[in-house]
């Protein structure tokens, strides 16, 4: 089944291909997203004449190719393996996995709505046009809220099911914000006061933001590191901002001077 809206890929486009047959002069590849057969010449697969084509591909392998020529009239497509960079391969494989996953989710949605399964593909194409990666809409529903669907030309019932499926099926990687705390004291028992201030800072953050993992540890006096980790990016941002406010309030109590500087990831 064709996963993409257009019938043929463009020259230079990255495509997902499953190796079907290895021949003397190359490999026949099934383009999974286009429901087409393509050919990869040997010189576009092997990196060196000292190697065999089977050192790079085997029947049944699914990997990323780059389109080098297209003849729609003859329905002939040629692809290259060796022209694909590692970073391109990773991004393309991720997009493909997302397309497959979104299509399955939308097929569930169509079943709930008693609509033809074929509509799922059209909705996926629309979401991809709007977001680049169709899975991003599900991630954004979880990350920032259902309002991301407000401007989409989808009916209300479908939006409700997308929100429901996103909350059930999508688990975002945790957001982590780190910073360096520089804190000093001019008091005779300054070490103990710094320790007490940092303990209270950590305790207060954990009480105010129980859903956020808070860790403070020494880098090398007067530098300490704070790590805040949570599932909701806005909550982690709020906790980091509050950490600076709490530290400022603790300076007078413990007679210390300190600040927090964010570590840019």
From Swiss-Prot:
Keywords: Initiation factor, Protein biosynthesis, RNA-binding. GO terms for molecular function: ribosome binding; RNA binding; translation initiation factor activity. GO terms for biological process: translational initiation. SUPFAM superfamilies: eIF-2-alpha, C-terminal domain, eIF2alpha middle domain-like, Nucleic acid-binding proteins. It comes from the Archaea. Transmembrane segments: none annotated. Belongs to the eIF-2-alpha family. Heterotrimer composed of an alpha, a beta and a gamma chain. HAMAP family: eIF_2_alpha (MF_00231). NCBIfam families: PRK03987.1-1. eIF-2 functions in the early steps of protein synthesis by forming a ternary complex with GTP and initiator tRNA. This is Translation initiation factor 2 subunit alpha. It comes from Pyrobaculum aerophilum (strain ATCC 51768 / DSM 7523 / JCM 9630 / CIP 104966 / NBRC 100827 / IM2).
